[in-house]
Curated annotation (Swiss-Prot):
Subcellular location: Cell inner membrane
Any one GO cellular component localisation term in the record: plasma membrane
Keywords of the record: ATP synthesis, Cell inner membrane, Cell membrane, CF(0), Hydrogen ion transport, Ion transport, Membrane, Transmembrane, Transmembrane helix, Transport
Domain of life: Bacteria
Protein name: ATP synthase subunit b
Cystine pairings recorded for this chain: none
Organism, scientific name: Coxiella burnetii (strain Dugway 5J108-111)
Pfam families associated with the record: ATP-synt_B
Length: 156
């Protein structure tokens, strides 16, 4: 194998090329590759952190939803209890008012009954007095007495 000057020059040029490449081209290239690797690693870490935050948010939202359902059920139960209480109060008040009205009606009926009874007694007294006057004005015999009593009874 013949080594000639052109092969040596080519080897020297190649070594210079490698040296220049290692000094000027390789460092920015490795920096760019390192920056890209770091950027990808940061992106993956951010994605993992985002996934964890999403899981935590889902858990928290489920807990809040469960708590909201519990509170809603509690509020509905309280509303039902309050409604039942109001209905019972209204029923009791209606019963009391009904009993009061019945008592007032009974009292009024009793007063009307007593007034009618008093009026009837007055009328009977008036008729009895009128009948007694007629009997005393006429001659007293059995037939006229029976006839006057029948008239009085028919008037009553």
């Amino acid at each position: 194998m013949d080594i000639n000057a052109s092969l040596i020059v080519q080897m020297l040029v190649f070594v210079v090329f490698i040296g220049l490449t290692m000094k000027f081209i390789w460092p920015p290239l490795t920096k760019a590759l390192e920056a890209r690797r770091k950027n990808i690693a940061d992106g993956l870490a951010a994605a993992e952190e985002g996934r964890k935050e999403l899981e935590l948010a889902e858990i928290k939202s489920k807990e809040q939803l469960t708590e909201a359902k519990t509170q809603a059920a509690h509020i509905i139960e309280q509303a039902n209890q309050r409604a039942n209480h109001i209905v019972e109060e209204a029923k009791n008040k209606a019963r009391e008012e009904g009993a009061h009205l019945i008592q007032l009606a009974k009292n009024e009926i009793e007063q009307e009954y007593n007034a009618a009874k008093t009026e009837l007694l007055k009328q009977i007294s008036t008729i009895a007095v009128a009948g007694a006057q007629k009997i005393l004005q006429r001659e007293v015999d059995k037939a006229s007495n029976d006839r006057l009593v029948d008239e009085l009874v028919s008037e009553i």
